Every structure is written in structure tokens, then in C-alpha cells.
């Protein structure tokens, strides 16, 4: 159960991190 929960949370947080990183790169490159 813990691993499943961690997987769900990890997926969401990773997606958020990727979005944030993409936005940062976009801003940096202008």
C-alpha cells in the first residue's frame, strides 16, 4: 500500500517538477 501511495504521489510531484522545469527553461531561453 505504501509503495502504491508513493507511486501516485511521486508521479504527481514529478509531473509538477517537469512542468516547472519546462517553464524555467522557456523563460531562460526567452
Swiss-Prot record:
Alphabetic keyword roster? ATP-binding, Chaperone, Cytoplasm, Isomerase, Nucleotide-binding
Query: What's its catalytic activity?
Result: ATP + H2O + a folded polypeptide = ADP + phosphate + an unfolded polypeptide
Give me the segments passing through the membrane: none
Task: State its location(s).
Answer: Cytoplasm
Query: What Enzyme Commission number(s) appear in the record?
Result: 5.6.1.7
Q: Which GO terms describe its molecular function?
A: ATP binding; isomerase activity
Cellular component GO terms held in the UniProt record: cytoplasm
Q: Keyword Cytoplasm: yes or no?
A: yes
Which enzyme class? isomerase
Where it mainly occurs, coarsely classed, is cytoplasm
Transport as UniProt keyword:
no
Q: What does the UniProt record say this protein does?
A: Together with its co-chaperonin GroES, plays an essential role in assisting protein folding. The GroEL-GroES system forms a nano-cage that allows encapsulation of the non-native substrate proteins and provides a physical environment optimized to promote and accelerate protein folding.
Q: Which family does it belong to?
A: Belongs to the chaperonin (HSP60) family.
Please give the subunit comment from the record: Forms a cylinder of 14 subunits composed of two heptameric rings stacked back-to-back. Interacts with the co-chaperonin GroES.
Q: What is this protein called?
A: Chaperonin GroEL
Which species is listed as the source?
A: Clostridium pasteurianum
Q: Gene of origin?
A: groEL
